Regions:
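Domain-level recognition of nuclease-like catalytic cores that cleave nucleotide substrates
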Residues: 103-131
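Anion (oxyanion) recognition and catalysis
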Residues: 26, 95, 118
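Well-ordered, non-membrane alpha-helical segments in soluble/globular domains
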Residues: 14-21, 81-89
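Conserved catalytic cores of phosphodiester-cleaving nucleases, focusing on short active-site segments
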Residues: 57-86
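Structural motif
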Residues: 37-38, 72-76, 104-107
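Hydrophobic beta-strand segments of well-ordered beta-sheets in folded domains
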Residues: 66-70, 98-103
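Active-site metal-binding core of divalent-cation-utilizing nuclease and nuclease-like domains
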Residues: 2-15, 27, 32-67
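Arginine/glycine-rich "motif VI" loop of SF2 helicases in the C-terminal RecA-like domain
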Residues: 91-98
Length: 131
């Protein structure tokens, strides 16, 4: 399997998770949903000052009086520091915007997710995604 095929397969799986998450947010009464999907406005990117790296949440949405941030857990064990930086940034942004940070956890990634949250003291709620 070549790299392009692997990327396409990963992208289509990510797209499926994002579509599933958008449906879930709509059912829960979120408004102003932004997602990296056709027919949706893209979420705003944020740059971490200490590293100059730019991060974009997978989804954002307004509910009640706050803005919530959502990220699909990819299980990236090679770039743990990037993952941790991204999650910490989104958790802090959610707090500033009177919202919450949610990690959308696909089947098989719960242990990885809970270990990172505990080890790096990151505040996030978990939402399970279907297979």
């Amino acid at each position: 399997m070549n790299t392009d095929t692997l990327m396409t397969k990963k992208d289509s799986k990510q797209m499926k998770y994002l579509q599933q998450a958008v449906r879930l947010l709509e059912k829960k009464g979120y408004r102003e949903i932004k997602a990296e999907l056709p027919d949706y406005e893209s979420p705003t990117s944020f740059t971490e000052r200490s590293s100059d790296k730019s991060y974009t949440p997978d989804l954002t949405g307004q509910k009640d009086f706050g803005k919530d941030y959502f990220q699909v857990v990819e299980g990236d064990k090679k770039n743990v520091q990037d993952v941790v930086s991204k999650w910490k940034l989104f958790a802090n942004l959610a707090k500033i915007k009177n919202g919450q940070f949610y990690l959308l956890v696909p089947y098989g990634r719960k242990k990885y997710t809970t270990e990172l949250l505990r080890e790096y003291n990151i505040e996030a709620e978990l939402m399970k995604l279907e297979r």
